[in-house]
């Protein structure tokens, strides 16, 4: 009996392991796995259904078909366990062994493994230094390869076709060895001496000059070193023994009607066995060479198809013309082993049902149908029934439950008390898509969901379904309650703002009760306290909207945790006073003394959470909801067709527009305007008309006339149902109301261009047939877009999760002093995001000083909370260096200080938080809200005039930032740098707006000047680029000869003459190489030098420049010598929305990217080559000049003799992130990418915290490229993991050796995921075959550091509560390590001990 118990016990012993290694299997290893050789292609006997002996399902090899029963039935039952039947040869064991026992096939001729042959780069090809084509010709018996040339003139590895082979045979006889097929390849691989080759390559690489050659050699070297280090032998890439999968993993299932369903693998194996047996027979018969060769080739093809069908040639198809599923197909793709069964599994104790509203639930509850609860909690009920003695055995309990006896329901209620369940709605786009609730038993069959969590789930009640899961163990229940309970997830992890916010009906109810109406019943009364208001309202003596005075008692908490009680009389309305009753103590009355629109309610909940804490907020949110529902019911707001009031002015506006359009049409007909201008003007007109109609409509809707209590007619905000819905933010928007009651406006054609004739009707009037037809396109496109968007957005999320999955908070502080410089985010002069918002929840990296002093006001290491934000804004600080995930120096993972605040909890992030996944979810989840389209700039948008001045919006003080300028005689400043900015600060010194100043801008104010709102402080000509002098002197023309390099032209209007420089291709031969310039000379006739340099002040003039000064003229500082006309910039399409975000994360190089200066120095133009300009930058430090060829059509922002700094823009265009990283560094890159991505999301009104984008960026910057290898084992140009290089460099510097130098590399998220250290994670992401091939050849180890790898091997993930488990395991293992001591050490210690005791 004891034996029996042990038998059941030893099934699940746990193997402790820390890493998984993948490698090539040697033939010996394959034989050692095997339980016998499969010799026949038969599967099962069609009459008896018993497996055939030696066949693919043979019971002798793979084990019995039934538990503990041999095939012939001689031995049955457990007592014969382990006996091998002498009659049928089957071991008596569990049938389960048929899932684990493998067999093998001895191949009659070796076969190359297709993965190592065809998966690029071909590993066999690299090792043998042959092209894939050549190897294939050998393998598929088209040519011979020389294996051993002997004393002949042939070379090893040389290919010979039939003719050449026979010629060689005649010439040399048996002196050489040349063969074909996989055996030849195997011989060659076997003959490679790795050590010798590695040495040879290491010597050869430094001596080669060509880049491509070096690349090829270092690839080969890497592969050889990998083979040497991993213990794999090259010849193992050619199979001599083929393993056979256990039969239960490729089942053969009898269907009714005598047919069988079989796994495709059986067909593939059958082909291999058939061909192999035939080949054996042919070899025994010593058949003619040509027949044997053909059979060998067929065997090679059969094995190829088994391993990876369709990789070479046409895929082998089954009876139904469908390609057979090979071993490779089993593991790759969405339906493969990795993604289907290892990363996503189905779980028991779960159910799903439709959801409905549960308006009476509390926030931590959900309604669970009794039927579902009974099924889900069955084991608990059985246990309880037995414990109570209501049932004697589990079987009896089961019967009771099946009969649904009354006591079962009592027990159920007891079992589910405080036992949380998890509710999940697919698609689970972020972690709030699964939350825990306490179940409340309900009748009916639908799950009831609390309305406030709908926003987090993105759920609505139009037929959505949700799944319920039961956490079984105590630990699981604890985690569900502590971490996943809906009441613990009030803030969104994406932006730290409340996600439990009322919407729709609740908002409408709260808005309705806090509106005021003129002359309502009870207006002007004064109440002693809130109770009195309540009584009077219930008695019907005062209306809900009446303006009254109320004495209130409030307790206001301040930031420091203290509170102040005060009593005051406020002017308010009855409704607001009633609402204040549910507001928790600690908040001021002012929070409700306003119409509660959606934004205000959200702010209120946020404030409540920050001031009075979680528990109060949860209770308050529930109360708000109940109140909102109650009052929206009382309000009786509904929509009737008469609520859509069409403005009377509509007809007049449309008629006027139609007249103007006719006017433009007639101008076009008489040729005064072009087609394009007409189109733009018409579109412009109609857009204006549409805006006017909607303005008229909204002003109509939003006001109504009433008589106040003095009998005077006054305007008050309207109580129109539709207006209230839109105004409160409950439902609808001005744009939607415009289509209902205004006019629908302009529509787009399928190609995206706008149709000139708008739809003047609205939905209330109804559309004509033509109007309806025009509008169908847009509607259908919208639906098609949505479907595409969902797929694209999901794919983006998947890539993001994959790149960031192993990023976990692993320590408190990495001790770095680096960080990112945070400044307010400015767009078009306005501050879009003030500094306070950007630093909230971050840790300060370096002390912040009070402006203009040495006093530290915020010490480094401070976590900035709301209190500090106020403080920073009070002290008008405009830049702060904060810690960031990008600059964190933690080796594996990230530290809590660099990450800062956990946005969903409001305090510093805990160790073990999976911040990478949270970042990926936060960015991916709103993906479906982004647009898919590319904005074509057309119509009204393309004609926005180029900016030509800075007009300030707010009064304040002028500040100039890194602006190089010269002062003109009239006192104005002229900008002579490209990156200057002008900012306006308010009286507190806070920056309100900031503008870029182009080169040549004339600035009419100076640093520190006060300006009023609306004043123009700088001006420039947007259509020309001036060349400004920085000194005064006399102009001298150089190389400017009329008719050769220049031409004079007279302006017809003004009569002024201009000199225009001719383009080189328009000049006569004499002028081709002359470079016209304007030189400055002093009074003594000597050349003037540019200030601070020894470069003569001469300005070379590019083609088409207009010179405005005469030869010999005197000019002053800041005068314009010449103007270069700017071609009006081509209207570029702005890629918006989701595609733009994907491009940024994939780090794609844009087309026609902007060109940046590679070094700091002086610009010059060298000799032009065909269609390109040669730009030369001479560095100021005297190093070698840098040259670059730039296409002629690119417009350059720089001119000869100008100073540029490294990374400055030379030619405009979209920025290339790789250039920014290379020239300006990591923080500039971070700033660029964060701002670009935020712009896309901000356009859709989505808030995401910067740190999530930085977290993904950290993962994209994991790799470095080796620039100099030093004494390390790295090869120049290798891409290595940053941490790996740093560890190696530390080791080298302790040994006083030369460390390697490297540059940071930016990888796109797909590439970064595939180049991760973990091959399991990479293989389960994409390109499974390639990843596994590479990992096997190099014998990679996966140390299971990320989350994904651990899910795949079925362990707790090293994040959250799992991190503690992993670190505890590590600690235990360190303790258990045996310490090895040598005998001599023991002896020495003993003598020492004896001596000391002797003394």
Curated annotation (Swiss-Prot):
A biological process term (GO) from this entry: DNA-templated transcription
Keyword Secreted part of the UniProt annotation: no
Binding site for Zn(2+) 2: 814, 888, 895, 898
Catalytic activity, EC: 2.7.7.6
Keywords of this entry: DNA-directed RNA polymerase, Magnesium, Metal-binding, Nucleotidyltransferase, Transcription, Transferase, Zinc
UniProt enzyme class: transferase
Pfam name, any one: RNA_pol_Rpb1_5
SUPFAM superfamilies reported in the protein's UniProt record: beta and beta-prime subunits of DNA dependent RNA-polymerase
Gene3D superfamilies according to UniProt: 1.10.132.30, 1.10.150.390, 1.10.1790.20, 1.10.40.90, 2.40.40.20, 2.40.50.100, RNA polymerase II, clamp domain, RNA polymerase Rpb1, domain 3
Catalytic activity: RNA(n) + a ribonucleoside 5'-triphosphate = RNA(n+1) + diphosphate
Chain positions recorded as Zn(2+) 1 binding sites: 70, 72, 85, 88
Residues holding Mg(2+): 460, 462, 464
Protein's job: DNA-dependent RNA polymerase catalyzes the transcription of DNA into RNA using the four ribonucleoside triphosphates as substrates.
Subunit structure: The RNAP catalytic core consists of 2 alpha, 1 beta, 1 beta' and 1 omega subunit. When a sigma factor is associated with the core the holoenzyme is formed, which can initiate transcription.
Family: Belongs to the RNA polymerase beta' chain family.
NCBIfam families registered for this protein in UniProt: rpoC_TIGR
HAMAP family: RNApol_bact_RpoC
Protein name as catalogued: DNA-directed RNA polymerase subunit beta'
Organism of this sequence: Pseudomonas savastanoi pv. phaseolicola (strain 1448A / Race 6)
């Amino acid at each position: 009996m004891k034996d029996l118990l042990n038998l059941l016990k030893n099934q699940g012993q746990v193997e402790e392991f820390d890493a998984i290694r993948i490698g090539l299997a040697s033939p010996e290893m394959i034989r050692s796995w095997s339980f016998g050789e499969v010799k026949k292609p038969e599967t099962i006997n069609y009459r008896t259904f018993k497996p055939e002996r030696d066949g693919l399902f043979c019971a002798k090899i793979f084990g019995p078909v039934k538990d503990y029963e041999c095939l012939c039935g001689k031995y049955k039952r457990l007592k014969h366990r382990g006996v091998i039947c002498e009659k049928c040869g089957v071991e008596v064991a569990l049938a389960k062994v048929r899932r684990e026992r493998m067999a093998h096939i001895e191949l009659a001729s070796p076969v190359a493994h297709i993965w190592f042959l065809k998966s690029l780069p071909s590993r066999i090809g690299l090792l043998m230094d042959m092209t894939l084509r050549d190897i294939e010709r050998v393998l598929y018996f088209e040519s011979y390869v020389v294996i051993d040339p002997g004393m002949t003139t042939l070379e090893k590895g040389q290919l010979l076709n039939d003719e050449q082979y026979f010629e060689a045979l005649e010439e040399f006889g048996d002196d050489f060895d040349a063969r074909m097929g996989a055996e030849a390849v195997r011989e060659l691989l076997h003959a490679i001496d790795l050590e010798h080759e590695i040495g040879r390559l290491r010597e050869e690489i430094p001596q080669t000059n060509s880049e491509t050659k070096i690349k090829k050699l270092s690839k080969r070297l890497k592969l050889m070193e990998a083979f040497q280090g991993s213990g794999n032998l090259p010849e193992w890439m050619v199979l001599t023994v083929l393993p056979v999968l256990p039969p239960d993993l490729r089942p053969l299932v009898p269907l009714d009607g005598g047919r069988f369903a079989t796994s495709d693998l059986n067909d593939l194996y059958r082909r291999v066995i058939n061909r192999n047996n035939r080949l054996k027979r042919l070899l025994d018969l010593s058949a003619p060479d040509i027949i044997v060769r053909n059979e060998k080739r067929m065997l090679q093809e059969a094995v190829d198809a088994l391993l990876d069908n369709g990789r070479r040639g046409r895929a082998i198809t089954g009876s139904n013309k469908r390609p057979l599923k090979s071993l490779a197909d089993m593991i790759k793709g969405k339906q493969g082993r990795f993604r289907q069964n290892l990363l996503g599994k189905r779980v028991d104790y779960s159910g799903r049902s439709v959801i409905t509203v549960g308006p009476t639930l509390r926030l931590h509850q959900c309604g669970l149908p009794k039927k579902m609860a009974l099924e889900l909690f069955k084991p608990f009920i059985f246990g309880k029934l037995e414990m109570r003695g209501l049932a004697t055995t589990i079987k009896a309990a089961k019967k009771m439950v099946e009969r649904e006896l009354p006591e079962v329901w009592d027990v159920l209620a007891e079992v589910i008390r405080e036992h949380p369940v998890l509710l999940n709605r697919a698609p689970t786009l972020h972690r709030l898509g699964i939350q825990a609730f306490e179940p409340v038993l309900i009748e009916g069959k639908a799950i009831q969901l609390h309305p406030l969590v709908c926003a987090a789930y993105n759920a609505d009640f139009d037929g959505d379904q949700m799944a319920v899961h039961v956490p079984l163990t105590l630990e699981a229940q604890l985690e569900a309650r502590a971490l996943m309970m809906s009441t613990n997830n009030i803030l969104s992890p994406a932006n730290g703002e409340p996600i439990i916010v009322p919407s729709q009906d609740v908002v409408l109810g709260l808005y309705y009760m806090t509106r005021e109406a003129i002359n309502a019943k009870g207006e002007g009364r004064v109440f002693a306290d809130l109770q009195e208001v309540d009584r009077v309202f219930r008695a019907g003596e005062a209306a809900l909207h009446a303006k009254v005075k109320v004495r209130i008692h409030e307790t206001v908490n301040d930031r420091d945790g203290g509170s102040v009680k005060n009593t005051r009389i406020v002017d308010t309305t009855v409704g607001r006073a009633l609402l204040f009753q549910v507001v928790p103590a600690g908040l001021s009355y002012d929070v409700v003394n306003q119409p509660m629109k959606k934004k205000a309610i959200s702010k209120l909940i946020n404030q409540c959470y920050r001031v009075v804490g979680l528990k109060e907020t949860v209770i308050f949110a529930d109360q708000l909801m109940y109140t909102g529902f109650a009052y929206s019911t009382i309000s009786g707001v509904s929509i009737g067709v008469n609520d859509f009031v069409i403005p009377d002015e509509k007809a007049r506006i449309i008629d006027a527009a139609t007249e103007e359009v006719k006017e433009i049409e007639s101008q076009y007909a008489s040729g005064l305007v072009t087609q394009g201008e007409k189109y733009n003007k018409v579109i412009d007109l109609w857009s204006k008309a549409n805006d006017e109609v909607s303005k008229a409509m909204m002003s109509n809707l939003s006001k109504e006339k009433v008589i106040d209590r003095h009998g005077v007619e006054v305007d008050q905000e309207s109580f129109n149902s539709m207006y209230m819905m839109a105004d409160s933010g409950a439902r609808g928007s001005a744009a939607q109301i415009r289509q209902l009651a205004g006019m629908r406006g302009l529509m787009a054609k399928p190609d995206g261009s706008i149709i000139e004739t708008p739809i003047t009707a609205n939905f209330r009037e109804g559309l004509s047939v033509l109007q309806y037809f025009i509008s169908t396109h847009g509607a259908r496109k919208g639906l098609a877009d949505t479907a595409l968007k969902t797929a694209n957005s999901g794919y983006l999320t998947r890539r993001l999760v994959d790149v960031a999955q192993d990023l976990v908070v692993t320590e408190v502080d990495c001790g770095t002093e680096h960080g990112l410089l945070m400044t307010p985010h400015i767009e078009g002069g306005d501050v879009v995001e003030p500094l306070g918002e950007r630093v909230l929840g971050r840790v300060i990296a370096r002390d912040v000083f009070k402006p203009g002093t040495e006093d530290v006001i915020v010490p480094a290491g401070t976590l900035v909370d709301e209190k500090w934000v106020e403080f920073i804004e009070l002290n008008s600080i405009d830049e702060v260096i904060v810690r960031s995930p990008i600059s964190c120096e933690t080796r594996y993972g990230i530290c809590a200080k660099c990450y800062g605040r956990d946005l969903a909890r409001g305090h510093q992030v805990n160790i073990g938080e999976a911040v990478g996944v949270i970042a990926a979810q936060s960015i991916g989840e709103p993906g479906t809200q982004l647009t898919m389209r590319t904005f074509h700039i057309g119509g009204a948008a393309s004609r926005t005039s180029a900016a030509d001045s800075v007009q300030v919006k707010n009064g304040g003080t002028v500040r100039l930032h890194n602006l190089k300028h010269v002062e003109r005689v009239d006192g104005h400043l002229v900008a002579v740098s490209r990156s200057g900015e002008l900012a306006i600060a308010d009286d507190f010194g806070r920056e309100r707006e900031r503008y870029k100043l182009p080169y040549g801008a004339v600035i009419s104010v100076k640093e520190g000047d006060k300006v009023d709102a609306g004043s123009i402080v700088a001006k420039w000509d947007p259509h020309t680029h001036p060349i400004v002098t920085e000194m005064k002197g006399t102009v001298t023309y150089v190389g400017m000869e009329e008719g050769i390099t220049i031409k004079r032209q007279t302006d017809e209007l003004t009569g002024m003459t201009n000199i225009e420089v001719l383009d080189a291709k328009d000049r006569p031969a004499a002028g081709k190489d002359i470079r016209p310039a304007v030189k400055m000379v002093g009074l003594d006739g000597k050349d003037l030098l540019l200030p601070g340099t020894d470069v003569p002040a001469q300005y070379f003039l590019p083609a088409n420049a207009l010179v405005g000064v005469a030869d010999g003229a005197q000019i002053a500082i800041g005068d314009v010598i010449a103007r270069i006309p700017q071609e009006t910039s081509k209207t570029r399409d702005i890629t918006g929305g989701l595609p733009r975000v994907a491009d940024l994360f994939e780090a794609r190089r844009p087309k026609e990217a902007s060109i940046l200066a590679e070094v700091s120095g002086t610009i010059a133009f060298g000799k032009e080559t065909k269609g390109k300009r040669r730009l030369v930058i001479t560095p100021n430090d005297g190093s070698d000049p840098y040259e670059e060829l730039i296409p002629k059509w690119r417009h350059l922002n720089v001119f000869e003799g100008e100073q540029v700094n490294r990374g400055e823009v030379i030619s405009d265009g979209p920025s290339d992130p790789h250039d920014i990283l290379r020239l300006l560094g990591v923080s500039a890159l971070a700033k660029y990418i964060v701002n670009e991505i935020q712009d896309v999301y901000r356009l859709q009104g989505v808030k995401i915290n910067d740190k999530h984008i930085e977290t993904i960026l950290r993962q994209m910057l994991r790799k470095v490229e080796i620039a100099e290898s030093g004494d390390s084992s790295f090869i120049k140009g290798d891409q290595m993991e940053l941490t790996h290089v740093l560890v190696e460099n530390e080791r080298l510097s302790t040994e006083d050796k030369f460390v390697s130098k490297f540059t940071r590399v930016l990888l796109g998220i797909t590439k970064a995921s595939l180049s991760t250290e973990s091959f399991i994670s990479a293989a389960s992401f994409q390109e499974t075959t390639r990843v596994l091939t590479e990992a096997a050849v190099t014998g990679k180890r996966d140390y299971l550091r990320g989350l994904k790898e651990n899910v795949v091997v079925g362990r707790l993930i090293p994040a959250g509560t799992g991190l503690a488990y992993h670190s505890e395991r590590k600690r235990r293992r360190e303790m258990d390590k045996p310490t090895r001591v040598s005998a001599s050490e023991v002896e020495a210690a003993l003598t020492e001990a004896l001596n000391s005791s002797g003394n």
